Amino acid sequence: MQAKVPETCLLTVRVLRASGLPSKDLVTSSDCYVTLNLPTASSHTLQTRTVKNSRNPVWNQNFHFRIHRQLKNVMELKVFDHDLVTRDDPVLSVLFDVGTLQIGTQRQSFSLGTQEKGCLEVEFRLQTLTDCEEQLISNGIVVARELSCLHVELKRTGDPKRSERKVQLVVAGACEGPQDASAGTGSFHFHYPACWEQELNVHLQDDPHEQLKVPLRTLPSSQLVRLVFPTSQEPLMRLELKKEEGPKELAVRLGCGPCPEEQAFLSKRKQVVAAALKKALQLDQDLHEDEIPVIAVMATGGGIRAMTSLYGQLAGLQELGLLDCISYITGASGSTWALANLYEDPEWSQKDLAGPTEVLKTQVTKSKLGALAPSQLWRYRQELAERARLGHPTCFTNLWALINEALLHDKPHEHKLSDQREALSRGQNPLPIYCALNSKEQGLSTFDFGEWCEFSPYEVGFPKYGAFISSELFGSEFFMGRLVKQLPESRICFLEGIWSNLFAASLQDSLYWSSEPSQFWDRWAQDQANLDKEQVPHLKIAEPPTMAGRIAELFTDLLTKRPLAHATHNFTRGLHFHKDYFQNSHFSAWKASKLDRLPNQLTPTEPHLCLLDVGYLINTSCPPLLQPTRDVDLILSLDYNLYGAFQQLQLLSRFCQEQGIPFPSISPSPEEQRQPQECHLFCDPAQPEAPAVLHFPLVNDSFQDYSAPGVPRTSEEKAAGEVNLSSSDSPYHYTKVTYSQEDVDKLLRLTHYNICNNQDRLREAMHQAVQRRRKRKQFRPE
């Protein structure tokens, strides 16, 4: 939706009085004041005066806000007891939905909500502003408002020595934050909400009382305005100000369906899929376009184990002629490494996978000591310093990304996510989608707050908010839906670092205690020896000694903090919420957080994203396939968990049930739980809109006795069928970064075999997907 909406109002809030407030002081009554915060109208927290020594304070103060009624305007009112010695004590906190107000005046009484009988009385007055219209762009969940840009040029006047004094320029609520400069030098710009009552504040850092305040609404648009500063003494500099309208077009796509590029890809891919299905299923006739099912591969995480297994399974699908039947491949954590490697070749699925598999073997079996060689560490440092210079936030995940690249490759790869578009240009390969989880850096676990973020060669975005950007712009700075600073696209290794930073926790601690590579790997191994099963690790990790190891010291100036999560510029920053966002079906399908009813605390209010490996919540890459607009019929679930063949799939099913997302119930029998088979089909005839799931857990069943489907093992071949997948000393534990040649060969053969040995079930499931499409076609109205 994009329109001029004449629903701007003036909200006057009169804080009247409070009564019966409890005393927070030992001897006297409280000294109370009230704060008001309305982020959709102002970046400031406003405050009443303090009324001393009273349980029944009277303020009778007015505050004014310019609001738009199409937004979700939630005001936070807080009462505090002022204290000269300690932190001010909170007395009352309340959230008030301004959208419940009608035009006119209304009084509200907010109780303490405890056994106390005290309350806060506030009067709200809402008036329509008929001469003020604002253009809003919305998808029904988030809203982009009008943007203004202020250009500031500082020019020196007078004595050059005096111009060495430092000044600070601030536009509260602007994207850029405070800007520091020497008096009379520098050029700056500020992006800020056009509808707010903003001002430019200039002050001397050694004399904060010497200020210049310029109300920005009074500045004429696109005209140069000259001022001098300071005004109370001989001027140090001249300011040249120019206010302009910000970009009208958004760089963030607000929409809940596939982007035009994905739709164009699917149109091409359908032809490949239709031909492959006709051949694989031996159909007599060509499939009509509305009979072609959407079939997807969903791969979980699991480090080197997941990467290796996915190679084996894709080779199996290719051998059966079924790989061209796939429209999407989704990956998480370790399986993203396989996809990132394969998609460097635009024709990978049309070629024999033996070549890429040999490269994989070389990397998986090589020594990893070189990843922390002095020359490598210096290279990491140089690249991190260059990224910081360009404007990328620094965090430990960036260092992990470079180390991980060295573990998986012999030299740096210049490949970027957007480069993978070439592999989709003719629909010749499935569309890859990589998954991550967005969380909060402080105070909340991923179970309290976790949002699915998807990465494709076309876009990166949040289905929950219907907000997406072109993949080459990920990492650049955005504000209110507009691109304000474009940074060079990161190499894909930095994205792999995000998608797989589950492994960075142990690596991070090992790094901080180690002085040389051998100590690092010894500590890494020691940390893993205590794990008897794979568990979801906690984000909080122990702090190192004051004197960190020499390896860590090389990066202390770049990584002053140790956040595990990847900090990157938030492309949803500055977007506001539509008044009915919570009822939107696309938002409600993914709301799973205690914060989802609190728009002032959701992701668009944060300057940075906090992106994590999905393994911190559920080890799955399925959510992108559950978007109703993708309309997936069949999911081939490739699960690489060593403990619990159905555990992660059951967690996903439970999540979908709670969210009302169509998905079959995952209820394996006790026998299946005890002895999982190579392949399990889950479907729900009562939910025709739910995809069928053909689940391939990582198990060693008939492979023990057969070297190939229908070919029994000889006594000499029995050892080749022994694959350790269950015990705590499995060579395939997710923390293992090096495999023996024998172990990697066994895992590749096992996963390839499990696909090929179930070719009949695969073909039958695909046949049912075709039938499902045909049934829907019959019942579709003309």
From Swiss-Prot:
Cleaved signal peptide residues: none
PLA2c domain boundaries: 245-782
Keywords: Calcium, Cytoplasm, Endosome, Hydrolase, Lipid degradation, Lipid metabolism, Membrane, Metal-binding, Mitochondrion
Residue ranges of coiled coil: none
Ranges of residues in domain C2: 1-112
Superkingdom of the organism of origin: Eukaryota
Binding site for Ca(2+) 1: 25, 31, 81, 83
Enzyme Commission designation: 3.1.1.4, 3.1.1.5
Outcome of substituting residue 78 to N: Significantly decreases calcium-dependent binding to phospholipids
Protein name stated in the entry: Cytosolic phospholipase A2 beta
Catalytic activity, as annotated: a 1,2-diacyl-sn-glycero-3-phosphocholine + H2O = a 1-acyl-sn-glycero-3-phosphocholine + a fatty acid + H(+); a 1-acyl-sn-glycero-3-phosphocholine + H2O = sn-glycerol 3-phosphocholine + a fatty acid + H(+); 1-hexadecanoyl-2-(5Z,8Z,11Z,14Z-eicosatetraenoyl)-sn-glycero-3-phosphocholine + H2O = 1-hexadecanoyl-sn-glycero-3-phosphocholine + (5Z,8Z,11Z,14Z)-eicosatetraenoate + H(+); 1-hexadecanoyl-sn-glycero-3-phosphocholine + H2O = sn-glycerol 3-phosphocholine + hexadecanoate + H(+)
Gene3D superfamilies, A to Z: C2 domain, Cytosolic phospholipase A2 catalytic domain
Claim: Lyase is one of the keywords in the record: no
Subcellular location field: Cytoplasm, Cytosol; Mitochondrion membrane; Early endosome membrane
